[in-house]
């Protein structure tokens, strides 16, 4: 134990359990709800896990395409726990797509989802979103 008091940046329980965050843009367009866990930019173990995932998915280069893929993989496997995506109201055959990290990478790589990926990654790295007062009642789910 250190002789110094250093406050915790996040509630460990909230950071691991995740928080549900809705995404509605400035124009009022709803992009769904996303359950995010805290992605700590200072956690060395998490940084190593990112590198392992990038290597596994073959995106270790510094090409722009690989940067996008690395961001999508990091968020899909380490930050995103679940989602409730909107369905196309004009398509009667539209189905709910359950969350999987593989589908999340595909979704987050879509050129039309760049803003979603960016907004979700920003929130997943924002420690103010993962404080003790943000605990949700998981017994309802």
Q: Where would I find each of the regions flagged by the language model?
A:
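Residues that cap or initiate secondary-structure elements
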Residues: 9-10, 27, 42
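Short, intrinsically disordered N-terminal pre-domain segments
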Residues: 1-15
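A structural detector for beta-sheet-dominated domains
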Residues: 7, 22-24, 37-39
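Generic, ordered loop/turn and secondary-structure boundary motif
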Residues: 5, 24, 84-86
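Short, surface-exposed, charged amphipathic helix/loop patches that serve as local interaction elements
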Residues: 30-141
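Short acidic-hydrophobic surface loop/beta-edge motif
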Residues: 16-29
